[in-house]
Amino acid sequence: MKINVNGIEMYYEKCGQGRPLVLVHGNGVDHNEFQNSMWLLRRHFTVYAVDSRGHGLSTPVDELHYSDMADDMAAFLAQLDLRDVVCFGHSDGAIIGLMTAMRTDRIGLLLAGSANMTPQGAAAWLRLALRAAYAVTKSPKLRLMLTEPNITVEELATITTPTVVIAGSKDLIDERETRLIAESVPGAKLRIFEGDDHSSYVVPKTRLADLILEEAASYAL
């Protein structure tokens, strides 16, 4: 399905029934990042797996900015009139989730997996690889990761949504930045999975489903 938001067509897949759950993928992938987990989660939620602008089946764009992607997500929630949403975002999706929570009160629980506040929050070797790849491809997706996000402690402090900040102990994101996010969002819970990397707690379908179900139950209204 597609919906028009902010001058683009935003693609999403929907399945299941129950409390709305929005899944937001990372950079360079699309809703299929969650394809396996969706079929478990649909037993408990109405699942919406979205493609961010410039990704998947959503409208291609020449420039990408997290602020635009968060505006898209806020508009998506408003147009579908989704409330008390559980939102799980991974990597770039977690950045979008945090910035969306600054814009709307429609999210009832935010699970932010492996987000960074600044480009420097990502591993140095990754930034070097991204620069080399961008020099050749000029990809908007790579440029986005090299220049953004630029989220401040003050901005995080405006979030009133119950938030769980998640990462792996072997993540690509500097653990100090992960901890700063958790410290800056009022009342946020921090979960760092020992031995996990940037994606290993997301890819196995049962692990992600169990994580979302556990946290949604903990924060049930």
Feature-to-residue mapping (PLM):
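Active-site loop/oxyanion-hole signature of alpha/beta-hydrolase fold enzymes
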Residues: 48-86, 210
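Flexible "cap/lid" loop of the alpha/beta hydrolase fold
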Residues: 95-103, 110-136
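Active-site nucleophile elbow and catalytic-triad environment of alpha/beta-hydrolase enzymes
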Residues: 140-155
